């Protein structure tokens, strides 16, 4: 299932697609977002990808955005309306949009759907995701070197495999730097709730965490780290504007290349459902610049591991297969908090 996942994003494919005739009219592309676009976070990064696609393709595409759409019936209604309005490509950018997207895709077989983080496909629905865990491991190495208490706090959305992968990879990296380190997890059961994200961050600080990270959609954790004087590994966006002294680095999502490639494939008539799980070497994720107070030897360690990942010489989860990683549902040693099951 996971073989040849990233071919749709290669330079060779982009060059090949450019040789095919384009639509006579702009391709109508819609993006459905689970939270407001805002200034940073999950949805903001997807919208940066949309804008990069527009910049790359110009008048070949015309985009529509619907933001702050709840998972469930609202998402289904919005996607159905977009399909009925003549959108030919719809990006459903939240995990809980999968079942609604599958239902709408069955009703509109001529419309192409791309779902972020899903695990089911259809004749006209593809899934895509990033190997966030690669950068999470590197961030854990950095956190393990930076923490004085040996405790990191992790504010997490829902206990789905993608989130569990990130928690485990972070813990593996942190414990490589400090074998006694702990990662304490608090679940939000929400992807975007700034008030609860802040509350969870404060609780983790009270429990001894002097480094925070998160898998949630607002800058609240970053702002709390800055306010309380603890360190931060930001997620989704570079949060230096919110945490100029707290941020060590950030795990940055980059969707522009993928969105551009998908739109080009639809325009060229070459689109097909071929699940994509891209990593750091594919440009889906990157580390933001390190803070000025990160020691040179720590940077050297993280960079050495990053190069090993890029070159395929190191895998954070060792011999686990892609299928095993994709189904991850339990914590590794060093993680504490309510279990994912």
Where are each of the predicted segments found?
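N-terminal secretory signal peptides that target proteins for export/translocation
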Residues: 1-5
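A residue-level marker of the well-folded mature domains of exported/periplasmic proteins
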Residues: 24-341
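Bacterial N-terminal signal peptides
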Residues: 8-21
């Amino acid at each position: 299932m996971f073989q040849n996942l990233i071919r749709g994003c290669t330079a060779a494919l982009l060059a090949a697609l450019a040789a095919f005739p384009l639509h006579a009219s702009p391709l109508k592309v819609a993006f459905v977002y689970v939270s407001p676009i805002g200034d940073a976070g999950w949805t903001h990064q997807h919208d940066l990808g949309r804008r990069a696609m527009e910049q790359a393709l110009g008048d070949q595409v015309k985009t529509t955005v619907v933001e702050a759409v709840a998972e469930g019936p609202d998402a289904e209604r919005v996607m159905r309306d977009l399909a009925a309005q003549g959108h030919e490509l719809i990006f459903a950018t939240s995990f809980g949009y999968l079942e609604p997207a599958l239902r709408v895709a069955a009703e509109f077989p001529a419309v192409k759907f791309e779902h972020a983080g899903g695990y089911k496909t259809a004749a006209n629905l593809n899934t895509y995701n990033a190997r966030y865990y690669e950068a999470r491991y590197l961030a854990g190495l950095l956190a393990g070197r930076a923490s004085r208490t040996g405790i990191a706090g992790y504010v997490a959305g829902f206990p789905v495999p993608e989130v569990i992968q990130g928690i485990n990879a972070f813990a593996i990296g942190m414990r490589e730097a400090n074998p006694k380190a702990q990662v304490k997890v608090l679940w939000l059961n929400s992807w975007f709730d700034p008030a609860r994200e802040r509350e969870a961050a404060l609780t983790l600080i009270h429990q001894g965490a002097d480094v925070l990270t998160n898998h949630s959609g607002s800058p609240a954790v970053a702002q709390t780290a800055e306010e309380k004087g603890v360190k931060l590994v930001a997620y989704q966006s570079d949060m230096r504007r919110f945490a100029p002294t707290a941020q060590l680095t950030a795990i940055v999502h980059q969707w522009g290349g993928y969105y551009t490639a998908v739109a080009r494939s639809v325009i060229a008539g070459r689109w097909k459902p071929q699940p994509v799980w891209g990593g750091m070497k594919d440009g889906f994720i990157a580390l933001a610049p390190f803070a000025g107070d990160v020691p040179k030897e720590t940077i050297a360690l993280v960079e050495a591991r990053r190069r090993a990942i890029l070159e395929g010489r190191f895998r954070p989860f060792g011999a686990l297969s892609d299928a095993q990683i994709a189904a991850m549902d339990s914590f590794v040693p060093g993680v504490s908090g309510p279990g994912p099951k």
